[in-house]
């Protein structure tokens, strides 16, 4: 008999609803996020993937009229990330984010990575140097920029900028890293570098990634969730979702019968 280790929960959405004003964008989402695993969110444009992703670091709090119902539990301390008593800044220290288009600050490479550390109160030069190097190494870009840390970040190539943004997210040692279509603006070589990096990163951090690329979801993720019209239609191990989906809507989307 083969015994499989049960994966550890890192986070869990419980009866999660989300509203843009009166428009209900997420409808009763219940979904686990497993520790040190990559979970891909797939589905047509406008189905709620990015809305769901951005709930984890309270990005929606930045805009009036947005509201949540339900919970996102974060483990091992069982914190409800959506609780009004939880500081969104603290949430964003624990939950990092990398956006669709590289968005380096108009600062030096060094200061891009040091920014979050300074916000957290780290001002010791040696400690900053060590943590900046550690983050840049973690994002597989240190060797390319170690001799030009005082160059302006926007002068980097697109792929380098995206890896710098990953380093910036890693600098505060997040427990969960959110990727919102991180390679859609990159060429195939840069895309391959990011995908390889995702495989390395999951050894130290849990990853939730939105992608429209079915092949990418199959390559990089351990678990896949298919969303449609704000609902979670199906969730499971990636190989099972792609080889033998349980819901016909999932099958239709994966096979291209529904876009």
UniProtKB/Swiss-Prot annotation:
InterPro entries: AAA+_ATPase (IPR003593), ABC_transporter-like_ATP-bd (IPR003439), ABC_transporter-like_CS (IPR017871), P-loop_NTPase (IPR027417), PstB-like (IPR005670). It is found in: Cell inner membrane. ATP binds at residues 43-50. Residues 11-254 form the ABC transporter domain. It is a peripheral membrane protein. Pfam families: ABC_tran. Its main location: membrane. It is an enzyme of class 7 (translocase). The keyword Nucleotide-binding applies. Coiled coil: none annotated. Keywords: ATP-binding, Cell inner membrane, Cell membrane, Membrane, Nucleotide-binding, Phosphate transport, Translocase, Transport. GO terms for biological process: phosphate ion transmembrane transport. The complex is composed of two ATP-binding proteins (PstB), two transmembrane proteins (PstC and PstA) and a solute-binding protein (PstS). NCBIfam families: 3a0107s01c2 (TIGR00972). This is Phosphate import ATP-binding protein PstB.
């Amino acid at each position: 008999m083969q015994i499989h280790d049960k994966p550890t929960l890192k986070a869990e959405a419980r009866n999660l609803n989300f509203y843009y004003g009166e428009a209900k964008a997420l409808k009763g989402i219940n979904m686990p996020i497993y520790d040190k695993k990559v979970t891909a969110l797939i589905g047509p444009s406008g189905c709620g993937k990015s809305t769901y992703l951005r709930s984890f670091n309270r990005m929606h709090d930045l805009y009036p009229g947005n509201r949540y119902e339900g919970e996102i539990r974060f483990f091992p301390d069982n914190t409800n990330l959506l609780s009004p008593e939880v500081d969104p800044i603290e949430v964003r220290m624990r939950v990092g984010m990398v956006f669709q288009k590289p968005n380096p600050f108009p600062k030096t490479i060094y200061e891009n990575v040091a920014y979050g550390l300074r916000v957290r109160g780290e001002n010791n030069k040696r400690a900053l140097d060590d943590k900046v190097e550690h983050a840049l190494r973690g994002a597989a870009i240190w060797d390319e920029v170690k001799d030009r840390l005082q160059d302006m970040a926007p002068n980097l190539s697109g792929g380098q900028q995206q890896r710098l943004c990953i380093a910036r997210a890693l600098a505060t040692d997040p427990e969960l890293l959110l990727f919102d279509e991180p390679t859609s603006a990159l060429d195939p070589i840069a895309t391959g570098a990011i995908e390889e990096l995702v495989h390395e990163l999951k050894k130290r951090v849990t990853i939730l990634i939105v992608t429209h690329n079915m092949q990418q979801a199959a390559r990089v993720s351990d678990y896949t969730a298919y969303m449609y019209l704000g609902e979670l239609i199906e969730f499971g191990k990636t190989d099972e979702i792609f080889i033998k989906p349980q819901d016909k809507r999932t099958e239709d989307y994966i096979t291209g019968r529904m876009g």
